[in-house]
Amino acid sequence: MLSARTVLSRAGLISNASRLNSTLVVAEHDETKLAPITLNAITAASKLGNEVSVLVTGANATKVAEQVAKVNGVKRVLVAQDEKLKNNLPERVAPVILASQKQFNFTAITAGSSAFGRGVIPRVAAKLDVSSISDVTEVHSADSFTRTLYAGNAVKKVKSTAPIKLLTFRGTSFEPAKEGGSGAVENAPSADIKTDLSEFLGQELSKSERPDLATAKVVVSGGRGLKSGDNFKLIYDLADKLGAGVGASRAAVDAGYVPNDMQVGQTGKIVAPELYIAIGISGAIQHLAGMKDSKVIVAINKDPDAPIFQVADIGLKADLFKAVPELTAALP
């Protein structure tokens, strides 16, 4: 492990006097239900030893706020409901966080380490003139953390002296918070939300009857070794037998075999299922960063020197075009 370093802050004007230790978690959701990574972030936030509040922003935030209030460990839920906050663009959410910080003087502001969290937390950190710490995998104390570096190939213990800690938590490193709470729900402080900084153009959502990659207990992923998109049927057939989610390596996505929402890796989705089956995937650093925390890893590859075998619990050196159909046929 690399040696610890100190994260310094230039924000000397932020007063620490008479502050109660308190943490704000910025919720991620789709206007109807809370994103699972927020539950992981709440668990991580509770390890700071502070009172935990959750900020829910959006055009229809009330329903999600009610869900959050029932989460164990949540003391307060702040709700900012405004049409300007539809789709929760980071440029529009940040002013609400800053207004909440001004009123409640939190000692830590956190979120899950997702595209949303990575968009909003550094923005708020810049406004507060402090350094943010990303991809935290372990909380040692209120000011000491372990985070990943170099696509997950190194870990580093860091200590922050900043008066406000700005953190994103890797979801797969923390258990999701359970229900059982009764947090108070109240309106968030009003904020000046500017709409000319960014614009939401639209999104295309893929529909699938298979489990979502982020929550699936079993994931079957295919790589460049499948040679074509049509051959991904081998992956789909096996996944359907196992009730699994389907993923892919970046190489398979870049080759056009499958859409990029299936990508597992540093620039894709981070997963940690009970079982991860990698088929025709060599095991590039970028891919390993997204799945190496899986409980059991099975690799099928004809190259005995493929890096994927270094992290696999079970490795099968075989031609995937023979091995996978045989495996699928053998399953009930």
From Swiss-Prot:
Gene Ontology terms: biological process: fatty acid beta-oxidation using acyl-CoA dehydrogenase
Matching CDD domains: ETF_alpha (cd01715)
GO annotations of cellular component type: mitochondrial matrix; mitochondrion
Chief location of this protein within or outside the cell: mitochondrion
Subcellular location: Mitochondrion matrix
A Pfam family per the record: ETF
Binding positions for FAD per the UniProt entry: 275-303
Record text on cofactor binding: Binds 1 FAD per dimer.
Keyword tags: Electron transport, FAD, Flavoprotein, Mitochondrion, Transit peptide, Transport
Required cofactor(s): FAD
Molecular function terms from GO: electron transfer activity; flavin adenine dinucleotide binding
Similarity remark: Belongs to the ETF alpha-subunit/FixB family.
Quaternary organization: Heterodimer of an alpha and a beta subunit.
Full protein name: Probable electron transfer flavoprotein subunit alpha, mitochondrial
Native species: Caenorhabditis elegans
